[in-house]
Amino acid sequence: MARQKFERNKPHVNIGTIGHVDHGKTTTTAAITMTLAKAGGAEVQNYEDIDKAPEEKERGITINTSHVEYETENRHYAHVDCPGHADYVKNMITGAAQMDGAILVVSAADGPMPQTREHILLASRVGVNHIVVFLNKADQVDDPELLELVEMEVRELLSEYGFDGDECPVVVGSALKAIEEGDDQCILDLMKAVDEYIPTPERATDQPFLMPVEDVFTITGRGTVATGRVERGVLHVGDEVQIVGMKEEIGKTTITGVEMFRKMLDEAMAGDNIGALLRGVQRDEIERGQVLAKPGSVTPHKKFVGQVYVLKKEEGGRHTPFFNGYRPQFYFRTTDVTGSIALPEGVEMVMPGDHIDMNVELITPVAMENNLRFAIREGGRTVGSGVVTSIVE
């Protein structure tokens, strides 16, 4: 049978399975593909196919992830499943696999466990705002009161980390039964809940314009050009933009031309690599590391709290721990900025392989917002990967 080409006729959503080890994340993923395959919305993926996740290198960090795609009547999904707990931690902090929402798999027989809590916390930190709960292995629980108790526990846990524990859908069932006995109503219910509860993300082109500046040069007689890849939004000739970062004050200019592949355009959009001609800006007034942005959409900051994964020695990271006051480079978008680290109270040092919250103060401000990813580098090599969880000032 010929492969159908990817039709973009449905909204696209990225999701993933999260939860404690052995609660059935991968089995649930397999059950979803089998159930949706009956309606022609997926190719069947067995547990083994998903479980032998290929190793991927994301910014030098080794992560095992399985990517599965499927569709319901309403949407097209890309679904990520990780075999190991460490893979989840790395995945969520580095943003290797973006998630618009998540399916939290909890064994009804065991209830919430330590990694259940940790994954919920991570999801809340990295901007996954919607979680649908699947209480798996319900066939192993004879007492309906016990099921209610577990559901209550999970809802309380979600509320504790800022999710809407009262409103989020909880679907009860057995992924294994769905696979082995074709008893897949619970999976249909689960996907209906995902369809209805996890909102379609705002497309990158609908967000306010932002382009990190990669290079700057002068065209004689025309002015200064900043080049880079448009991260989000749309830019039109004649738009006013701000120049943000690397300095305390915010610059302002008007776009007098947009060029792509040596052709002049009227507009550029998210994903385009462009050169933007800036009115009245001198060559030395703009530099790599700044961003061009829609006025008022992003501001420069020096102090923030970040959730960071510290690379292990085997991943090319440090061989030794670091301590309070450590001063590496923080790589945001297109440039390195030196910053100093303050560790949480009671934490003496950070070992390679740890993940931790840290307070950072940069020596120059960077255009920054929550959920912005960064790398920590030392002498040009990456030693950590992080995400901004809150801006201090």
UniProtKB/Swiss-Prot annotation:
Catalytic activity: GTP + H2O = GDP + phosphate + H(+)
Region feature (G1): 19-26
Predominant cellular place of this UniProt entry's protein: cytoplasm
Residues of the tr-type G domain: 10-202
Classification via InterPro entries: EF-Tu_GTP-bd, EF-Tu_GTPase, EFTu-like_2, EFTU_2, G_TR_CS, P-loop_NTPase, Small_GTP-bd, T_Tr_GTP-bd_dom
Binding of Mg(2+), residues: T26
EC number: 3.6.5.3
Keywords for the protein's UniProt record, in alphabetical order: Cytoplasm, Elongation factor, GTP-binding, Hydrolase, Magnesium, Metal-binding, Nucleotide-binding, Protein biosynthesis
Region (G2): 60-64
One GO CC annotation: cytosol
Record-linked SUPFAM superfamilies: EF-Tu/eEF-1alpha/eIF2-gamma C-terminal domain, P-loop containing nucleoside triphosphate hydrolases, Translation proteins
Domain of life where this protein originates: Bacteria
Region named G5: 174-176
Compartments, record wording: Cytoplasm
Key word Hydrolase present: yes
G4: annotated segments: 136-139
Regions that span the bilayer: none
Sequence positions that bind GTP: 19-26, 81-85, 136-139
Keyword check for Lyase: no
GO molecular function, one term: GTPase activity
Region (G3): 81-84
Subunit and interaction comment: Monomer.
Protein family: Belongs to the TRAFAC class translation factor GTPase superfamily. Classic translation factor GTPase family. EF-Tu/EF-1A subfamily.
Function: GTP hydrolase that promotes the GTP-dependent binding of aminoacyl-tRNA to the A-site of ribosomes during protein biosynthesis.
Protein name: Elongation factor Tu
Organism per entry: Clostridium novyi (strain NT)
Phylogenetic classification of the source organism: Bacteria, Bacillati, Bacillota, Clostridia, Eubacteriales
